[in-house]
């Protein structure tokens, strides 16, 4: 399983792209098999322009980098309260583009005035991907003490010390020149007097490492060389007219000089990397710059303001200087207006500046903690947690691969029809709708649903008679006759069950209008239990915000014996494994360990012993109270030696009353989604729906059924 590292910026202008590139290079140096994932595009120019980091990675490496979701699409989903849909799209995009990677580097959103939702969305994405969080921040005007306070404040907004996925922090632009607002202000221009020069607050990286509340995984000092931009980038920013191209694509601008004085007072600024800004009616400055160029000084560029046409005689005089590669370009604005435009120049790395990108990567990588990078590919002891969007995505993918047929006896029920259409569209399963074709098509049309490929409609009136003989044969020991069989086959659940029994379909889903008893009774009579199973039980998949839990049994067995409870535990653990959840089974009771007595506790204790004996490969412990099973701090005091306490993923309730009450209380109080009940122990998969099931509930139950069918047939 890939390690997922998410870089989350704490503010604007922290240099997120530079840090991402540096971490990528640090991983490349260690031979890490890496993939880069930007969930949501955030182009600086706004709109749906290409994302900066993703474009740079694609243009400058062979690393796989997924196409991010467009910001306009994300904003549309958020404005229509569809954050769950957004998270599912992100997890789908993640899985589609990060296969075979040892480490996936995820880049979060930068919080801006326009995107004030960035941090809350970053937190949701981190939870969805179960990512290890690394904050990226710049020093700004902070002293070491203030910086540590800001680190602690940032951690608290992401769950604080309880969030064990917070791995550390990377401090960028350490000891950079900043203004009073903490914005980086490199002194490119000589136009300002000393009173406006930026300040530098010195911090020792070694001392910062010692005092930081989080591990400092990188402390990157400010480097002026990294912002040296190409002359062509300046020309593009100003929308300038190029007079002489020269080396405009490779010359670097390291300072800006406004030539308002006489030549003798400006000669010291005629140096390599200078952008000389002068009015186009100052031929003396132009000629002086040309002389410097002919003497080997690689001036960054010459910028002419005012829009004056260059005298042809001057151009002729400067030909040899132009031939040295001196870039010259012109704007129509005056010098003052031009200076204002230059101050708004974006110092970010352009996507096509390969040389600068390489320099940034090498420089930043030198300051990323090498031990941390090495640890990313070491054997991880982090237990796997499956987030709800990841779980739902996994259901869809596994069902697609299974390619199964699922019969829906309530074929003309509106929610069922809609769910069948969704399953067909997503390729989850081929749904067989039982019902009158005209009525089913009418229901579909009334909902704007198109029933195309991937959906079959079977008219019970046409096929019912063909199943009479088989039903009589299966139930002849119970006195079944043909007239009674015909009467029972009027029930579409019975008809669908016989289709399943004869392998015409792979699974059955019902319950949107039928009771649980009506759904389960025919399969129990005709399909019966799987080999090795003495009972049928059920589980609910509880989709908590950060993790998926398995609850059993909350729907079938009123008061199981110790032996039955042990079997339910084993069935539930196997179901967890089948759906990608690492099973740590808590046998629940009202007391923990040996602290309680009584028949109820003894039943759970005996069930735990039996389950452990039957399946020593599974992690099973009990009796445990619910809080001891889920809360690490409670587990330390109540069950310090338990391998399950504080980290359980599968919860086995002692009876139906406790299980059903707890399931509904957790579901309602936490306002979370649950999927189920999924029946366990059947020879072939049959699943029951709640009569209040939503369309999505039906879709995921169909997916569960298809996956069960695939696993049972292996």
Curated annotation (Swiss-Prot):
Name of one Pfam family that matches: DRTGG
GO molecular function terms noted in the UniProt entry: phosphate acetyltransferase activity
Biochemical pathway: Metabolic intermediate biosynthesis; acetyl-CoA biosynthesis; acetyl-CoA from acetate: step 2/2
Alphabetical list of InterPro entries matching this protein: DRTGG, P-Actrans_bac, P-loop_NTPase, P_AcTrfase, P_AcTrfase_dom1, P_AcTrfase_dom2, Phos_Acetyltrans/Butyryltrans, PTA_PTB
PANTHER family cross-referenced by the UniProt entry: PHOSPHATE ACETYLTRANSFERASE
Domain notes: The N-terminal region seems to be important for proper quaternary structure. The C-terminal region contains the substrate-binding site.
Protein name per the record: Phosphate acetyltransferase
Species in which this protein is naturally found: Salmonella typhimurium (strain LT2 / SGSC1412 / ATCC 700720)
Origin organism lineage: Bacteria, Pseudomonadati, Pseudomonadota, Gammaproteobacteria, Enterobacterales
